[in-house]
Amino acid sequence: MRMIKFLLLAILLAPFVAHSSGQEVKLDKAPIDRADKESLQRGAKGFVEYCLTCHGANFMRFNRHHDIGMSEDDIRADLIHTGQKTGDLMEAAMRKKEAEGWFGVVPPDLSVIARARGADWLYTYLRTFYQDTSTYSGWNNLIFDKVAMPHVLHHLQGWQVLEPGTGNLVQTKPGTMTKEEYDRFVADLVNYMVYLGEPHAPYRRELGITVLLFLFGMLGLTYLLKKEYWRDIH
């Protein structure tokens, strides 16, 4: 129930906390594959390294990563760097007062951000930051105008500027990754955030199929039983 309320609140507030830059931007299709556990593990590591400092994921516990093939030792080595236990919630390292002082607003919890925004929106958002000297952070975003969040991945992607007149992004300084490598990194990160929003989704689908098959089977048995009961009457 708590997750449902949070998701509804995020959806309702989205139009008030973000708006586009005045031009229509086509969202890129995110290559999501929830069955790819290696991608989910890479995404989990990237999330902890680059997102969990400011953003929390308070509906998720570290030990839930057993679902994506991570052992207890893997979780401790790759995901826990602050002395937390594997059964603890994934809380942001930065305190709320500090975050508000830095960004003017407390960074949102990312537990259900993929369900609120959509995978394609996140995939496009994380790849369309550009330098903008008119903003407080020095960064802006093609689909989230005047975003408070700085581009924390700029050293990976490189520096981009918005080309006047065309609305295209042009790279002015390369990062440590090629475009293909960065796109793959973001795809893994978004894939993980989709998993984060509903870790039990694969089990729910399997259970749903099993229940439907059971009901269809029961329907057939019920029909045969009905025919047997009414055989003498008909």
Swiss-Prot record:
Compartments (UniProt record): Cell membrane; Cytoplasm
Protein topology in the membrane: Single-pass membrane protein
Domain annotation Cytochrome c: ranges: 38-193
Cofactor annotation remark: Binds 1 heme c group covalently per subunit.
Cofactor(s) needed for function: heme c
Domain of life: Bacteria
SUPFAM superfamilies: Cytochrome c (SSF46626)
Homology family: Belongs to the cytochrome c family.
Quaternary structure and interacting proteins, as annotated: The soluble ammonia monooxygenase is a nonamer composed of three alpha subunits (AmoA), three beta subunits (AmoB) and three gamma subunits (Cytochrome c1 PetC).
Protein name: Ammonia monooxygenase gamma subunit
Organism of origin: Nitrosomonas europaea (strain ATCC 19718 / CIP 103999 / KCTC 2705 / NBRC 14298)
Organism taxonomic ancestry: Bacteria, Pseudomonadati, Pseudomonadota, Betaproteobacteria, Nitrosomonadales
Gene designation: petC
